[in-house]
From Swiss-Prot:
One of its GO terms (cellular component) is cytoplasm. Binds 1 Fe(2+) ion per subunit. Disulfide bonds: none annotated. Transmembrane segments: none annotated. This is tRNA N6-adenosine threonylcarbamoyltransferase. It is found in: Cytoplasm. It comes from the Bacteria. Belongs to the KAE1 / TsaD family. GO terms for biological process: tRNA threonylcarbamoyladenosine modification. The lineage of its organism: Bacteria, Bacillati, Mycoplasmatota, Mollicutes, Acholeplasmatales. Pfam families: TsaD (PF00814). Substrate binds at L133, V134, S135, G136, G137, D166, G179, D183, N272.
Length: 331
């Protein structure tokens, strides 16, 4: 089964061609990072306009790179949410138009489901499994019992982990996107500052990073007030040590309690080298499945893989009406 998939939930424009829920025939991705860098973050209206400008080119590139014809496509899948509503609508309208014009079945896919199924591209998901989903907008622990059978165990009570990284980067004047810069600098410094590790004892599966973020702000502010010299690398290392310790320990505890066969680490923050390293060092009795870096970030291949399994269980839409949502329910 050949699927054309579209992903425009935030600031990456991506169109992919996948086959049988496993093989990626093409995965065209166009990042808008340079467009948004002067503003210190994603500007929704600018993101939407950039998607519009590149959409036709990305459709053409994905089909050509895959070496297929439009008539070979069995299903069109598109990210339905969550995400920036303007960006989502660009992708949905493009996918719907393409599907209707060529009379190909259409399906909407949850963006977060796509992140989970990115692990299936280069590995083999073994159920039941535990997923740590970490991104700029989400931090969740999920019990995946089978294909599309997902139970939300815990989530963030305030800042998502990727959001916390970006805010700390902004405090330190590191620019946008901040997460990769903090990760890189953390490896050049030492975790010499004793920052809090918010484990939330009464809520073992939930997360909270706002207090840690505030502690970093206070630490830097106080050192500047005292004219005390400090290395940004050490601040980054201390922050990352606290974040990864919480993420890894909560994941380990949940896996032990639930008796899962595998752990999947997914989402944009799954590209973080500190997290990937600590996860493998601390959890040695279970297989840890983490997508390669190119499949951690937003791209359409993961949407195509998820769509294959969703189609097998639910089928396609009965018509070509698809509504986007910035806060679509995951479960």
């Amino acid at each position: 089964m050949i699927i054309l998939s579209v992903e425009t939930s935030c600031d990456e424009t991506s169109v992919a061609i996948t086959k049988d829920g496993k093989t990626v025939l093409s995965n065209a991705v166009l990042s808008q990072i340079k467009i948004h860098q002067p503003y210190g973050g994603v500007v929704p209206e600018i993101a939407s306009r950039a998607h519009i400008e590149s959409m036709l080119y990305m459709f053409d590139k994905a089909i050509k790179d895959a070496g297929i014809k439009v008539s070979d496509i069995d299903l069109v899948a598109v990210t339905q949410g969550p995400g920036l509503i303007g960006s989502l609508l660009v992708g949905i309208n493009a996918a719907t138009t393409f599907a209707y014009a060529n009379q190909i079945p259409l399906m909407g896919v949850n963006h977060l489901l796509g992140h989970i199924y990115a692990a299936q591209i280069e590995g083999e998901m073994k159920f039941p499994l535990l997923t740590l989903l970490v991104s700029g907008g989400h931090t969740e622990l999920l019990l995946v019992k089978d294909h599309l059978e997902i139970e939300l165990l815990g989530t963030t009570l305030d800042d998502a982990v990727g959001e916390a990284y970006d805010k700390v980067a902004r405090m330190l004047g590191l620019g946008y996107p901040g997460g990769p810069v903090v990760d890189r600098l953390a490896h050049q410094g030492e975790a010499i500052y004793n920052l809090p590790k918010p484990f939330l004892k009464n809520e073992p599966f939930n997360f909270s990073f706002s207090g840690l973020k505030s502690s970093v702000l206070n630490l830097v502010h106080n050192m500047k007030q005292r004219n005390e010299p400090f290395k940004v690398e050490d601040v980054c290392a201390s922050f990352q040590e606290s974040v990864t310790e919480v993420l890894v320990q909560k994941t380990k505890d949940a896996a032990n309690n639930l008796g899962v066969k595998q752990i999947v680490v997914a989402g944009g923050v799954a590209a973080n080298k500190g997290l990937r390293t600590k996860m493998k060092e601390r959890i040695t009795d279970l297989e840890i499945l983490t997508p390669s870096i190119k499949y951690c970030t937003d791209q359409a291949a993961m949407i195509g893989i998820a769509a294959y399994y969703q189609f097998k269980k639910q089928g396609a839409l009965k018509d070509y009406y698809l509504k986007g949502s910035s806060a679509i329910n995951f479960i």
